[in-house]
Amino acid sequence: MSVEERPVIFDDQSELPKVFVGGRKSKLALVQTQHVAAMLKKVHPDYSFPVLGLTTLGDQVQSKPLYSFDGKALWTKELETLLLEKVPGFDQQDIIVHSLKDMPTVLPDGCELGAILTREDPRDALVMAAGSPYKTLADLPAGSVVGTSSIRRSAQLKKSYPGLVYESVRGNVGTRLSKLDDPETPYKCLILAAAGLKRLDLGDRITGYLQKPDMLHAVGQGALGLEIRQGDEKTKKILEAIYDKESTLCCLAERAVMRTLEGGCSVPIGVETKYENGKLTLDAIVVSVEGTEFVECTQVRAVEENWEAEQLGKDVAEQLVKDGAKKILDAIHLENIK
């Protein structure tokens, strides 16, 4: 890592004690990181929260679909280095802000998940090209091209809409929308996370929402996860004021499903959670890449503690394996090795 990466830095230069908050350099990531810093400043006015925006491997390599990457730390490794080490030219970070769906379920030694914040809309959004007469995927003519780099999305949609064509589209949200609206575009629509569009004030581009039975969202989608150094009790205490219990229980259950199944960006695992009256409902699905095979499981349980949410996720994953998910996942792993 070198200073030539030209990070983005926001620092009020105050004399207050500093708690350094880092995140990715993309527009959406910076919006999210600055949002977290503002939340923290509101509840801890006696501290300063400088923001760092850094380019990660996932930002640098735009020519490959996400599922072709074997690594599970595609968006996090460089930032975790700054959390754990003193790197020349950089301030050591105290908090790293992640879109939780991009955060590996097994963190590097020395790191821990310090807090999960109130979740934004976790659903996937359908975005039609500007001026399109179509309102739903069912409206599209056979052979229409749907843009998504998520194997989870394409696998589930192939199950419900086998007559459509699914092609990768990379880039930040603005770049993807520009590709969609280009008169020469091959895409009829895109599938994007609703939360990201809303955080960028692009909610008006949402044509509709995808949900059961057509689509279960990604693990942790719509939530922000804050990574800290393991054992950093001071920072953990600072984060207590912005932690959200309901979002935490839901997301921990979802992450336990993926951790138990050993999944990452290259595995089509979808989830949906709901927490009401002390009961957590967890629905999870594993789908083959072509959408021809799938296994789904739903369980409901009284949950109050984090460990109970994680146990629910583990139990759902184990039931999926018993029902045939391992066969689907093994086939995907073998295909990725080829």
Swiss-Prot record:
Keywords: Heme biosynthesis, Porphyrin biosynthesis, Transferase
Cofactor(s) it depends on: dipyrromethane
Molecular-function GO term, any one: hydroxymethylbilane synthase activity
Cofactor note: Binds 1 dipyrromethane group covalently.
GO biological process, any: heme biosynthetic process
Pathway(s) where this gene product acts: Porphyrin-containing compound metabolism; protoporphyrin-IX biosynthesis; coproporphyrinogen-III from 5-aminolevulinate: step 2/4
PROSITE patterns: PORPHOBILINOGEN_DEAM (PS00533)
This enzyme's EC code(s): 2.5.1.61
Record-linked Pfam families: Porphobil_deam (PF01379), Porphobil_deamC (PF03900)
Residue list for modification S-(dipyrrolylmethanemethyl)cysteine: C265
Signal peptide: none
Catalytic activity, as annotated: 4 porphobilinogen + H2O = hydroxymethylbilane + 4 NH4(+)
A cellular-component GO term for this protein: cytoplasm
Function: Tetrapolymerization of the monopyrrole PBG into the hydroxymethylbilane pre-uroporphyrinogen in several discrete steps.
Extra remark: The porphobilinogen subunits are added to the dipyrromethan group.
Family to which this protein belongs: Belongs to the HMBS family.
PANTHER family, per the entry: PORPHOBILINOGEN DEAMINASE (PTHR11557:SF0)
Protein name, entry field: Porphobilinogen deaminase
Organism (species): Yarrowia lipolytica (strain CLIB 122 / E 150)
